[in-house]
């Protein structure tokens, strides 16, 4: 409105600006001119001694004619005089504002309108009042400057009130010593300019508002046409200003008690508008009528401090500006910290969402890159690009993402069984480090590598027997992805190397930690020691229902559940897909046998996975395909689980043999109990 700020006020508002602008409010408030204000508004008994001096207008007892009337209740006449003066303030305020809306600044017109609305009398006291006011202006200016707070009202109010109140009731002491010409010596425009410059210094908006409502002197500079109640002695006015300044510093609540005309809504808005900047000192005189009584803005300025706002007026949460205060931070948390906190929370939320939406293989790839970026180059160089198998594996991974198990996706690798079996883990390690010299050399090195590092990037694809790789790749990937079948601890870690991503790393797939208690890792798991031989994984997916039943029966404590597997028709294709929840709820297995079965299946698939379904997704080496039995028999049996010792201290029985029965006994290894000596079932 007056300063170009968009103000949103209720349809019926008592603020000064709305009185001017709204015809509805003008008409409604015009009725208030004749309605007596309640005593609570007019008589502020709690006022400080600055207001306690006797009125001085009726009995002349006061030292000056400018004492605020009736605030210290003395007798009936004083109270009546004060009421009339307060009403006069209302009248002059409304009438002058109506005139100012039309840019009519003619003081005589306003005064005459006031005279008409109020039955003013005693015009003969004008000269005395002017004279008295002139003297008071001279005396009060230094006192007002001390605080730098010019608690002034617009000249329109002062001029109108002066004439009407001077005419109404003047004490005989108003005609004292000063010559009459001192009174009208300052023009209203000059006085207003001085007021505007004073207000622009450091005053809060409430100061002029409060004085406007109470009819207090506007900083002692009021020209002689100010009304008598404005003129207090300099020491009294200084006390008034000090009190107002202290109230403004305490916050809006300190001023609310002293605003006689402020309704609850207006007090709230004034509280919001605390510490408003004063009007521009260079304001043009044309806007003088509308600049001073500016309505309290509904929106707080950007730099307004927010500590004084009540909790019900503050923004609802951190970092979120609202219409009431547009700075994100307030009170206990500075804006910068609030913004940083909100930014961090949003970043975490986005990262979590992205992690949930990422396909398993992409997530695994990202984890691997972040964990071992230096190993990715050799891995990619060594890994043959088999588009068909890669697509198949990715499809299996996505299908198996259904479980809540960690996303342990297998990296895409070349066909696993493309090469002969890996004779020894040591040789296998050497081969991948060399860059996969030859299928044969890579196989021996891979066997060691599988056990020790479980590197999928090794030439293990060549090392694995083709038969194993065909069905086992997708299946193993699926199992690894699923990761919920802890009982499926990888038994053919060496075979997984063929698909392994890291050719030269001793840790499986660049695990950030050497051995984690959360992973059930045998030699197959890729955590096997250098001397261990990784058991070759076998193609579980080719098992029949009888093979699965024999495998389950060969596991200690699981024989009683073979009937359930047979009834449900679980074969090699579906066995790796069984989650712990399926085994426990749908098939009625107990926790121990269920975990054991899943661990053994995982071992046969050459997969290491987190038995406890830890939510963190960790890259794991894909299952290594074990060499065919014939190849194993040729002297490459070191790959069998029997030779390979699990990190838990037990050697694993030969897992490389294709028959599940043989591996059942040997692979029935739980994280703490590998049984290398178990007979092959």
UniProtKB/Swiss-Prot annotation:
There is a cross-link at residue 72 (Glycyl lysine isopeptide (Lys-Gly) (interchain with G-Cter in SUMO2)). GO terms for molecular function: chromatin binding; DNA-binding transcription repressor activity, RNA polymerase II-specific; histone binding. This is Sterile alpha motif domain-containing protein 11. Keywords: Disease variant, Isopeptide bond, Nucleus, Phosphoprotein, Repressor, Retinitis pigmentosa, Transcription, Transcription regulation, Ubl conjugation. Residues 41-77, 212-234, 251-307, 407-498, 625-681 are annotated as: Disordered. Expressed in the outer and inner nuclear layers, ganglion cell layer and rod photoreceptors of the retina (at protein level). Widely expressed, showing the highest expression in kidney, prostate and retina. Changing residue 45 to E: In RP; uncertain significance. Residues 219-234 have a biased composition (Basic and acidic residues). Self-associates. Component of a Polycomb group (PcG) multiprotein PRC1-like complex. Interacts with SAMD7 and PHC2.
